[in-house]
Amino acid sequence: MFTDKDQNFVKVELDTTLFLGRKHIGEEFFDLLLRYEGIYLPERWDTEDRARLRRSFDRSCLPEFIEEWTRADEWKTLFFTRKRPSPIELSVDIQRHEGAKFNEFSAYIHESHFKSTAQEKELLNFTIDMSLITGADYGLIAHRRQERRQSPVLTPAERLPGIYWA
């Protein structure tokens, strides 16, 4: 997984007040990853952040995936990863408790993927499609190196000004 020391990636963060742990949202999320193929199609997934995620990601894992997606845990994170052609990591935080305010989708794409404007457009289209599925209330796309040179992108959840869309 990417560490705080790595700066060579673009991050996408989508936050929503919509509860994501519903079956139809999990199915739409799964279908979106399959539809985009290429770099956005994970090779592996898991419910814990491990050096090597244990479960393969393909059409046959849908029942197991939906079972984990809808499991009534107070707070869970699902992790997805792909190593080639460029590293990418995705995660979904699903909170189901009284004080829950936001559920979150995050993506970290290594900068080596962005060789032309075609990859940038693909990222924007993927982000738009994911925001429609998650019902994103706000989100951001930022290059980690630039964010560190300036200041962190802050969000409305932190009640501070930042670069975001609503």
Spell out what each predicted region is.
Residues 19-91:
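N-terminal low-complexity, intrinsically disordered segments
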Residues 22-33, 116-129:
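Well-ordered, non-membrane alpha-helical segments in soluble/globular domains
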Residues 1-45, 49, 148-166:
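C-terminal interaction module
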Residues 114-118, 147-150:
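Short, well-ordered, mixed-charge alpha-helical segments that flank or form enzyme active sites
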Residues 35-42, 125-140:
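Structural alpha-beta junctions
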Residues 1, 63-67, 127:
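Intrinsically disordered, low-complexity boundary segments flanking structured domains
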Residues 6-14, 95-115:
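Glycine-rich, often proline-containing surface loops adjacent to acidic residues and nearby aromatics
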Residues 63-104, 138, 142-166:
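Aromatic/basic-lined ligand-recognition segments
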